[in-house]
């Protein structure tokens, strides 16, 4: 199995949809009911996020993926599966995957995509945007150091997906 990650707006959902159209099983961790949730970092209690929450709330919470549920989901696929997403605790489950791909693009592009997307409200509010902009460089360089394969999503979607498929088959 393979994992595709990257900050909000780099094209993870679009890549997942196109992989599905090409007959490659894929799912977005944000789209699977109860797989991911916000938790309070101190109390570990589940929390509800909505657009427009302040910086204080975001400092105290993180988006996490349930590793056991993820393993169970991956094991339901007989052939390869491509999982896409980004969670605060993804370091805990990256070792489940044969390869990890890091989608990246310039900030102007991912901000424009966030503003224009209709499938996810995260990042539309100023505070969320600022957090993504403060966070993405460190996030990306850390993943590359961990061996993620960088894929530039400034290119047309079809070329991005072709590159990923080539890397999966090698």
Regions found by a protein language model. Give the residues of each.
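Conserved phosphate-donor/acceptor-positioning beta-strand/loop module used by diverse small-molecule
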Residues: 96-117
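Walker A/P-loop
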Residues: 13
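Glycine-rich phosphate-binding loop used to anchor ATP phosphates in small-molecule kinases
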Residues: 55-97, 103-104
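P-loop (Walker A) phosphate-binding loop of NTP-binding proteins
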Residues: 7
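Hydrophobic anchor at the beta1->P-loop junction of P-loop NTPases
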Residues: 4
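Small-molecule kinase domains that catalyze NTP-dependent phosphoryl transfer to phosphate-bearing small molecules
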Residues: 90, 116-163
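ATP-binding Walker
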Residues: 10
């Amino acid at each position: 199995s393979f994992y595709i990650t990257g900050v909000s707006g780099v094209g993870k959902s679009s890549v997942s949809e196109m992989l599905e159209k090409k007959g490659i099983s894929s799912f977005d961790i944000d789209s699977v009911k109860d797989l991911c949730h916000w938790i309070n970092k101190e109390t570990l209690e589940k929390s509800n996020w909505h657009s427009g929450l302040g910086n204080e709330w975001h400092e105290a919470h993180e988006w996490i993926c349930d590793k056991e549920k993820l393993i169970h989901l991956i094991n339901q696929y007989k052939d390869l599966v491509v999982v896409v997403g980004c969670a605060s605790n993804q370091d805990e489950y990256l070792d489940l995957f044969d390869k990890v791909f890091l989608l990246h693009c310039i900030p102007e592009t991912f901000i424009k995509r966030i503003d224009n997307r209709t499938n996810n409200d995260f990042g539309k509010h100023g505070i969320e945007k600022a957090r993504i902009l403060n966070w993405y460089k460190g996030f990306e360089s850390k993943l590359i150091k961990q061996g993620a394969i960088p894929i530039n999503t400034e290119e047309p979607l079809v070329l991005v997906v072709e590159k990923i498929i080539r890397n999966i088959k090698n």
